[in-house]
């Protein structure tokens, strides 16, 4: 499987320089678009986590920005005019509960008891855009598939 995007640095709209309307509770919440190619034909579900291991020296743990589980592959729209097999559109995290309610978005690091942040599920169980306080960080989007939820 291969993940790709139309950028190599997360664009401002999806991170700390996003417009005010893209924030909720002081956190950028509009998720970035990406593509998934070379998916195993036996796979029925997608799962992923978007994490920041560079946060460990800053806050003491790897920051979880977004986690998704049990996303049915057949619920995603295939664009036969596109060269990519699957496209995750911008703002998918906020749209997902209404579009595919059986898919779970796990708690992100904003839910940590060490931070004392929001308890709003729209913040703690959705995408949280990068806001590194010290320097540019390297992020990882880890993608998994399964044949059962």
Regions found by a protein language model. Name each.
Residues 1-146:
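N-terminus-centered regions that define maturation/targeting leaders and the start
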């Amino acid at each position: 499987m291969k993940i790709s995007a139309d950028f190599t640095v997360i664009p401002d709209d999806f991170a700390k320089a996003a417009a005010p309307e893209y924030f909720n509770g002081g956190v950028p919440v509009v998720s970035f678009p990406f593509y998934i190619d070379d998916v195993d034909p036996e796979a029925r579900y997608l799962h992923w986590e978007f994490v920041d291991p560079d946060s460990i020296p800053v806050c003491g743990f790897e920051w979880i920005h977004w986690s998704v589980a049990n996303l049915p592959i057949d619920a995603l729209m295939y664009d036969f005019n596109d060269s990519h097999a699957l496209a995750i559109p911008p703002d998918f995290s906020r749209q997902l509960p209404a579009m595919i309610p059986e898919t779970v978005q796990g708690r992100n690091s904003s839910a940590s008891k060490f931070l004392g942040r929001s308890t709003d599920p729209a913040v703690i169980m959705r995408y949280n855009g990068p806001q590194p306080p010290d320097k540019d960080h390297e992020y990882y989007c880890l993608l998994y598939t399964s044949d059962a939820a």
